[in-house]
Amino acid sequence: MQLLSPAFAYGAPIPKKYTCQGAGISPPLTFVDVPGAAQSLALIVEDPDVPKEIRSDGLWIHWIVYNLSTTITNLAEGAEIFAVQGLNTSGKPVYEGPCPPDKQHRYFFTLFALDVVLPEEENVTRDQLYEAMEFHIIEQAELMGTYEKS
């Protein structure tokens, strides 16, 4: 399975339009070779480079989406999501564009193929989603982009 974006390659800068300095819309994503046994998909976008004085765990969650249909092969930029969105670190169930406070940060987009459709819960956090996905991840794929404020 692969997670790709026509907007940026793995390790490349994320275009400004997908950040807090632009429109702040979600980037286009493409899902390739999703396993046939998958019953649903989940997506987590996170920044592990947050200064410890801002977040003690050094992690900022930008987007959580789960129970995406396995028939979906892509998400257009700024796409309306027909799945469940969990809470980002700001406490909102939406995409929050990169907005590093200090230097260039890495942003990991991780796609999970699951062997179940997860129970739909309100206000799911990253940790709760990982707990729900435990023992159900068939495969995962990662796309990493970078961003530094100009």
UniProtKB/Swiss-Prot annotation:
CDD domains: PEBP_bact_arch. It comes from the Bacteria. It holds the Pfam family PBP. Gene3D superfamilies: PEBP-like. SUPFAM superfamilies: PEBP-like. Belongs to the UPF0098 family. This is UPF0098 protein CPn_0877/CP_0992/CPj0877/CpB0906.
